[in-house]
């Protein structure tokens, strides 16, 4: 950071930084926390979800928790490109939203959704066709393969909707509605997923527990669609009024 500051002072002399201007601004701080706190909560929710699912699965067999752990590691390779896409999408949407350029905002959202869908379809296809190959990366035993192959195929069904939900969540944050993103994330990983997984575990059939992921994703997709429509409507009004 000091090195970057030094380079900035050398090459950007038109920007002058004075100590008297570095002060606490409650209005700016409020906006930072309004966007940042939901992101912090969403990051922590994943740990709670993992803990809850492990507790539910361990009742059946420790191998089920091993399968879930393997899945959690493998799925990161599918979701990582989506998160990278988000990192590039959010500043573009935020800038053009502030500049009242609706066409660029909606074009960015549309292209991001298409790209996310392609990535997720590829991930879904790999999980459907090569589940045993993926599990063998973890030296899976016969028991682990017997549990893991159907698990990966069932859980990967949720990929088909997950791309849209993740993009929508980032759109909410980019346009200044982080609460929508928080609600969707909480419902997806806690309010729906864990209770449904627990209820399905009461049947005594492990394969049914995996269906809690697609069920939670359907609920997430529904909420994301509703919130996105509201966001689009309000964003259009704001950008049109700014343009006028």
What is the meaning of each model-derived region?
Residues 44-71, 77, 95-96, 133-142, ...:
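Helix-terminus/linker motif at the lipid-water interface of multi-pass membrane proteins
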Residues 21-52, 56-57, 77-81, 85, ...:
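Hydrophobic faces of transmembrane alpha-helices in multi-pass small-molecule transporters and flippases
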Residues 67-125, 129-131, 162-184:
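Small-residue-rich hydrophobic transmembrane alpha-helices
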Residues 28-35, 57-76, 103, 142-149, ...:
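Interfacial/gating helices of multi-pass transporter permease domains
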């Amino acid at each position: 950071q000091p090195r970057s500051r030094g380079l900035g002072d050398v090459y950007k002399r038109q920007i002058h930084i004075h100590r008297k201007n570095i002060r606490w601004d409650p209005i700016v701080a409020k906006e930072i926390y309004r966007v940042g706190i939901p992101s912090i909560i969403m990051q922590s929710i994943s740990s709670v979800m993992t803990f809850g699912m492990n507790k539910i699965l361990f009742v059946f067999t420790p191998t089920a928790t091993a399968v879930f752990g393997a899945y959690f590691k493998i799925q990161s390779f599918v979701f990582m490109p989506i998160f990278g896409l988000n990192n590039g999408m959010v500043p573009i949407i935020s800038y053009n939203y502030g500049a009242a350029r609706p066409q660029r905002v909606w074009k960015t959202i549309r292209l991001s959704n298409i790209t996310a869908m392609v990535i997720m379809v590829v991930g879904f296809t790999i999980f459907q066709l090569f589940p045993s190959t993926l599990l063998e990366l973890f030296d899976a035993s016969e028991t682990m393969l017997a549990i893991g192959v159907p698990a990966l195929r069932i859980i990967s069904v949720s990929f088909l909707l997950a791309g849209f939900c993740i993009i929508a969540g980032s759109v909410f944050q980019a346009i200044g509605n982080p609460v929508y993103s928080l609600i969707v994330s909480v419902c997806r990983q806690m309010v729906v997923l864990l209770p449904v997984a627990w209820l399905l575990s009461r049947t005594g059939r492990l394969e049914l527990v995996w269906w809690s992921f697609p069920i939670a994703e359907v609920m997430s997709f529904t909420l994301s669609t509703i919130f996105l429509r509201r966001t689009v409507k309000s964003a259009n009004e704001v950008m049109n009024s700014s343009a006028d």
